[in-house]
Swiss-Prot record:
Signal peptide: 1-19
Tissue expression: Expressed by the skin glands.
Keywords annotated in UniProt: Amidation, Amphibian defense peptide, Antibiotic, Antimicrobial, Cleavage on pair of basic residues, Secreted, Signal
InterPro entries from the UniProt entry: Frog_antimicrobial_propeptide
An example Gene Ontology biological process: defense response to bacterium
The keyword Cell membrane belongs to this UniProt entry's keyword annotation: no
Protein name: Phylloseptin-Az7
Entry-annotated residues carrying Phenylalanine amide: 61
Cellular component terms (Gene Ontology): extracellular region
Family: Belongs to the frog skin active peptide (FSAP) family. Phylloseptin subfamily.
Main location: secreted
Its job: Has antimicrobial activity.
Lineage: Eukaryota, Metazoa, Chordata, Craniata, Vertebrata
Localisation per UniProt entry: Secreted
Species this chain originates from: Pithecopus azureus
Amino acid sequence: LKKSLFLVLFLGLVSLSICEEEKRETEEKENEQEDDKSEEKRLLSLVPHAINAVSAIAKHFG
């Protein structure tokens, strides 16, 4: 009885460990996707400033 109880507890811990690892990997992927989206937003927010700068330079030299 002790051996089977030990085996059940051991397998439960292994299963829990695997689930935690998968959860951690999923969270890391989600965080990477959020980081990518925030980078895209930052770059897109720079576009109007770049356009204004180009147009100002064109007016200055044009």
